[in-house]
Amino acid sequence: MQNELDAYFEYLRSARQLSGHSLDAYRRDLDKVLTYCERERIAGWRDLQGRHLRHLIAEQHRQGQSSRSLARLLSSVRGLYRYLNQEGLCEHDPATGLSAPKGERRLPRLLDTDRAMQLLDGGVEDDFIARRDQAMLELFYSSGLRLSELVGLNLDQLDLAAGLVRVLGKGNKVRELPVGSKAREALQAWLPLRTLAGPADGAVFIGQQGRRLGARAVQLRVRQAGVRELGQHLHPHMLRHSFASHLLESSQDLRSVQELLGHADIGTTQIYTHLDFQHLAKVYDHAHPRAKRKQDTDT
């Protein structure tokens, strides 16, 4: 079974060109299935049945795995069996008809508008690291980039004159995003300093040795900016969530927000309508004269 898994991972890496992060997620999920098969003495992928997966999902759920994680595990199994069927190694999919237990959907954490402005409007020193970090923060918030999209960004994807950035998102889909004036200013201040570092390639964001910044380095810089400016931990996806929520709050155009985020399914984007409702509810509670009725003291 391990041999088939290794061949599948190589297929994902070479033919599907999945990122290392996505490959790691597939590997974690399918390693759980393989461990279960070894424990239950299931000899091969042909022998794995729906009842086995139901047992594994129930077991993982009891151990505290979230519904989202279990849904991803089932998706990983379906992907594996599509490959096995294409290769003539199997003729069934044990995940057919199975779904993860429904759980309470967690709303993403984000910054409100005032906190976002506080983060971005702090003074910026005129040095390599400060200018680079400011440009990253502004671009995350201006254009709603994923971490992988920012890390992989090259100069030929930027058109600052037109105020556009072209990013390669999930599924190798290219989308064109606007770059706001503040982000353009931050990038224009950063790019001359980038050139002085002798960049090794066309990466927009590099370290002082000229090499492209990795995902962990970007996460660290964003976290440090959050602690310094806001006194809280901050991660890149919070800026993407903030971009989406603030844009939806102002425009009420869910379909456009979906396109900007690169979501294949509008259901994924609809989570931000719940966040917008939370904001409206807070405004209502604070401002409406009959939102909070005083307890009647008459007897």
From Swiss-Prot:
Q: Where are the transmembrane segments?
A: none
The record places domain Tyr recombinase at 106-285
Determine the domain of life of the protein's source.
Answer: Bacteria
Instruction: Locate the active site.
Output: 146, 170, 237, 240, 263, 272 (o-(3'-phospho-dna)-tyrosine intermediate)
Q: Which GO terms describe its cellular component?
A: cytoplasm
The record's listing under SUPFAM superfamilies reads: DNA breaking-rejoining enzymes, lambda integrase-like, N-terminal domain
Core-binding (CB) domain spans which residues? Answer: 1-85
Name the family: Belongs to the 'phage' integrase family. XerC subfamily.
The UniProt subunit note reads as follows:
Forms a cyclic heterotetrameric complex composed of two molecules of XerC and two molecules of XerD.
Q: NCBIfam families from the xrefs?
A: recomb_XerC
Q: Which HAMAP family match?
A: Recomb_XerC_XerD
**What's this protein's name?**
Tyrosine recombinase XerC
Species for this entry:
Stutzerimonas stutzeri (strain A1501) (Pseudomonas stutzeri)
